[in-house]
Amino acid sequence: MKRSMYAGRVRSEHIGTSITLKGWVGRRRDLGGLIFIDLRDREGIMQLVINPEEVSASVMATAESLRSEFVIEVSGVVTAREQANDNLPTGEVELKVQELSVLNTSKTTPFEIKDGIEANDDTRMRYRYLDLRRPEMLENFKLRAKVTHSIRNYLDNLEFIDVETPMLTKSTPEGARDYLVPSRVNQGHFYALPQSPQITKQLLMNAGFDRYYQIVKCFRDEDLRGDRQPEFTQVDLETSFLSDQEIQDIVEGMIAKVMKDTKGLEVSLPFPRMAYDDAMNNYGSDKPDTRFDMLLQDLTEVVKEVDFKVFSEASVVKAIVVKNKADKYSRKNIDKLTEIAKQYGAKGLAWLKYADNTISGPVAKFLTAIEDRLTEALQLENNDLILFVADSLEVANETLGALRTRIAKELELIDYSKFNFLWIVDWPMFEWSEEEGRYMSAHHPFTLPTAETAHELEGDLAKVRAVAYDIVLNGYELGGGSLRINQKDTQERMFKALGFSAESAQEQFGFLLEAMDYGFPPHGGLAIGLDRFVMLLAGKDNIREVIAFPKNNKASDPMTQAPSLVSEQQLEELSLTVESYEN
């Protein structure tokens, strides 16, 4: 029989209609001689009623044999429920069954197919095809499809060209570790799976495509966390002849359309812009969450004369004020915050409480001489908690930024209904890597330096600024972009600043440098992390919830057991030898 419609779409206007439905048994109940079945499909749940007085003995026997997750086909007449179920979109109707057949049976599932299950993550991933049957998971992927549909429509209307770039590319330094693919034809040589289509999309601009986009899989072999996966999807854009402001305008329009199409929300344009230095100094993060206050405050000048060497001898002293919540933090609670501070490189965490117009706490005795100045500088009020970090500027900012976010979550200070977009601009071109002992690209080595600071490529790299911009949503980096270098001499200077010899630059990027001999236009673009964007729209805190078949925190797939060992024959064909491994 042909399916008439989805079970989840049956409504009161279908009363009296004969229909055929197909789906899974969610639940079976026997009440007063009648059998009630919740039939579930992609669109929702529909109640079926089997009355022994209205069906054949064989249909009744089949109904009695049904168990959860059996796949069935059922025909009958839509009728009004005696008592509506307001919790279901189909709650006003039910199907009086006339015909019923089993299309497939099912073993008992390792967890119930319903929202709010308590199964651990690896069990959910081991049986991902069952996990994806749950309504909330299906909704996540409907949302994802709406997002990509909205993006494609928007960019197509702006005459962007959707172009596929290679999955097998050249391994290049400056970034996360590559996933390498050995070549059988070219023995001893390796492809890399792309961390992004960065260079190829730039070459498309040199080819005259003018406006390119792609919704593309990318790969990075890096340590995993809640908003990272080894393979991920990004919305990749590149344009020619546009300014950074014009590119940002296009991206803002795209996001506004997605928010309207998927959430029914109008977002205010243009998005706020914040300089990188302001973000770090005021929020302790280059991806600040602006849904709550508790900004970092610099007290270096206020405390420099106190008789407390931790403060007076520190490079900077900064603080955050937790307003009207001092009573929520015992000494034990503050000790936990101190341990977190140490994880970010701080030597410790000083603190005060303010009540009855006076300060108290372990360091209060050192600050009595400046109590009035401190109270005024921090605008202290009754029941405030003050947390101090005295260290380098970088450590103070990062530590207090992390504490700010943690405390806001603990105290439920965040309005989760808000979607606060903003641009972070005026980026440094380079950042110092303690691990590498050198400056590295803050974004990538193809970012255009500002005209005012480009001369420092041969001088103080800390002073070079980039024509770069990150878009941030609710404390997450949603995406990043920049204008690109299109002049060969500037690109060669950039490589030299990063420590490349002329020979190594030619070996790694010779094809790009050669392309710059042939009229490379001014260009720039941006990439947005699609998984992260959908995660935030869906109100989730892990991108695994919006990726159909993700990896776990060990970069493994519990369902397929990937990665796995391969046969000796496969290794021999590739001239590879595995020296050692652990099962």
Curated annotation (Swiss-Prot):
Subunit structure: Homodimer.
Pfam families documented for this protein: GAD, tRNA-synt_2, tRNA_anti-codon
NCBIfam families assigned to the protein according to its UniProt record, in alphabetical order: aspS_bact, PRK00476.1
Localization terms from the record: Cytoplasm
Family label: Belongs to the class-II aminoacyl-tRNA synthetase family. Type 1 subfamily.
Keywords: Aminoacyl-tRNA synthetase, ATP-binding, Cytoplasm, Ligase, Nucleotide-binding, Protein biosynthesis
UniProt entry tagged with the keyword Kinase: no
Protein source organism: Streptococcus agalactiae serotype Ia (strain ATCC 27591 / A909 / CDC SS700)
Function per UniProt: Catalyzes the attachment of L-aspartate to tRNA(Asp) in a two-step reaction: L-aspartate is first activated by ATP to form Asp-AMP and then transferred to the acceptor end of tRNA(Asp).
One record GO biological process: aspartyl-tRNA aminoacylation
Reaction(s) catalysed (UniProt annotation): tRNA(Asp) + L-aspartate + ATP = L-aspartyl-tRNA(Asp) + AMP + diphosphate
GO cellular component: cytoplasm
Name of the gene encoding the protein in the UniProt record: aspS
Residues that hold ATP according to the record: 220-222, 229, 477, 529-532
Protein name from the UniProt record: Aspartate--tRNA ligase
EC identifiers of the protein: 6.1.1.12
InterPro entries reported for this sequence: Aa-tRNA-synt_II, aa-tRNA-synth_II, aa-tRNA-synth_II/BPL/LPL, Asp-tRNA-ligase_1, Asp-tRNA-ligase_1_N, Asp/Asn-tRNA-synth_IIb, AspRS_core, GAD-like_sf
Gene Ontology MF annotations: aspartate-tRNA ligase activity; ATP binding; catalytic activity, acting on a protein; nucleic acid binding; transferase activity
Region called Aspartate, residue ranges: 198-201
